[in-house]
Structure formats: structure tokens, C-alpha cells
């Protein structure tokens, strides 16, 4: 498998809306395996395909935050939601920045698994937050979109400085 390049804000490709996966193919298996390798390499807890410039509705969640194995969700949709929770979130596409974001504490998801079967998954707490965060990516939304414009401008300036330091 291989590690994919993660897009970083303000890359406009992060704002693209992912297309549904029509059929589970060998290429989809390869994409999900590469996404998992990338997530582990970058020490993330979740990753959306759009973060690695693949415009398909695929998310992966680290096994520690899923149940007992990595969670792969294709074409995920939230079909039920309730309660509220807010913890400090970070993102592989927005390095070195964290913020509190309001989320639903409980969600029920409908998605397709790698066998092509429709599944429903209930999640709460950190798993719920992680799934919502990754689904946002599929819709071209970043966690900083929940913040004020002033905070977003500060983040952008900080990331530009960070990028200059790295070069």
C-alpha cells in the first residue's frame, strides 16, 4: 500500500463535494487501504477521501475510535441525530490548530461497506464527532467553518507562516 498526500487548507480542492461511489471495485479497495495507511502514517483518527484529493464519498476511522477494527464507510449519510457535544477538534488538513466545534452527541449512519452491503451504525461521543467531521469533508466543509471569520483569518495567517517555515 502507499501513503497519499494530504491536502492542506486553504487548498480549494478541500471545498469540492465528493461524488457517491457507484460500485465497490478493486480500485475502491485500494483507495481505502491507502487511506488507512495514510491515516496511520499521519497519526490521524479519521480521514475523508477528499483530503487526499479523491472526490468520492469514502471515510475511514481509526480502529481505536471505532469498535475493534478500522471503520470504512462508503456514501455515509446521517439518518438520525440528537443531543449535543463539543470537544476540541483537530484536522490533518489544518495542521497545528484545534478548536471546539458543536456536534451531535448521538448519530445513526447509513452507509455501504466494502462488501457492497448497506449498513446502519450508531455512534456517540468521540466516534460520533469523528464521523461527523469526516462527512463534513465529503461536503466541502471544514471544522473551521464553524468558527468566526476572524478566527478563520488568524488560522490562515498561521498556516501561511508554517508553510514558509517548512520550505
Swiss-Prot record:
<protein>
    <recommendedName>
        <fullName>Peptide deformylase</fullName>
        <ecNumber>3.5.1.88</ecNumber>
    </recommendedName>
</protein>
<dbReference type="GO" id="GO:0042586">
    <property type="term" value="F:peptide deformylase activity"/>
</dbReference>
<feature type="binding site">
    <location>
        <position position="133"/>
    </location>
    <ligand>
        <name>Fe cation</name>
    </ligand>
</feature>
<keyword id="KW-0648">Protein biosynthesis</keyword>
<dbReference type="Pfam" id="PF01327">
    <property type="entry name" value="Pep_deformylase"/>
</dbReference>
<dbReference type="InterPro" id="IPR036821">
    <property type="entry name" value="Peptide_deformylase_sf"/>
</dbReference>
<dbReference type="GO" id="GO:0043686">
    <property type="term" value="P:co-translational protein modification"/>
</dbReference>
<keyword id="KW-0378">Hydrolase</keyword>
<keyword id="KW-0408">Iron</keyword>
<comment type="similarity">
    <text>Belongs to the polypeptide deformylase family.</text>
</comment>
<comment type="function">
    <text>Removes the formyl group from the N-terminal Met of newly synthesized proteins. Requires at least a dipeptide for an efficient rate of reaction. N-terminal L-methionine is a prerequisite for activity but the enzyme has broad specificity at other positions.</text>
</comment>
<feature type="active site">
    <location>
        <position position="134"/>
    </location>
</feature>
<dbReference type="GO" id="GO:0046872">
    <property type="term" value="F:metal ion binding"/>
</dbReference>
<keyword id="KW-0479">Metal-binding</keyword>
<feature type="binding site">
    <location>
        <position position="137"/>
    </location>
    <ligand>
        <name>Fe cation</name>
    </ligand>
</feature>
<dbReference type="InterPro" id="IPR023635">
    <property type="entry name" value="Peptide_deformylase"/>
</dbReference>
<dbReference type="GO" id="GO:0006412">
    <property type="term" value="P:translation"/>
</dbReference>
<feature type="binding site">
    <location>
        <position position="91"/>
    </location>
    <ligand>
        <name>Fe cation</name>
    </ligand>
</feature>
Amino acid at each position: 500500500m502507499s501513503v497519499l498526500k494530504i491536502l492542506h487548507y486553504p487548498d480549494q480542492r478541500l471545498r469540492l463535494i465528493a461524488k457517491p461511489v457507484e460500485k465497490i471495485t478493486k480500485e475502491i479497495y485500494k483507495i481505502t487501504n491507502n487511506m488507512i495507511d495514510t491515516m496511520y502514517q499521519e497519526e490521524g483518527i479519521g480521514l475523508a477521501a477528499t483530503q487526499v484529493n479523491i472526490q468520492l464519498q469514502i471515510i475511514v476511522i481509526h480502529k481505536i475510535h471505532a469498535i475493534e477494527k478500522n471503520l470504512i464507510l462508503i456514501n455515509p449519510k446521517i439518518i438520525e441525530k440528537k443531543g449535543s457535544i463539543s470537544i476540541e477538534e483537530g484536522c490533518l488538513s489544518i495542521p497545528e490548530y484545534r478548536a471546539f466545534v458543536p456536534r451531535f452527541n448521538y448519530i445513526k449512519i447509513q452507509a455501504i461497506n466494502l462488501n457492497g452491503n448497506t449498513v446502519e451504525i450508531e455512534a456517540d461521543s468521540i466516534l460520533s464527532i469523528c464521523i461527523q467531521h469526516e462527512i463534513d469533508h465529503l461536503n466541502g466543509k471544514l471544522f473551521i467553518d464553524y468558527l468566526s471569520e476572524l478566527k478563520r483569518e488568524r488560522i490562515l495567517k498561521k498556516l501561511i507562516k508554517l508553510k514558509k517555515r517548512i520550505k
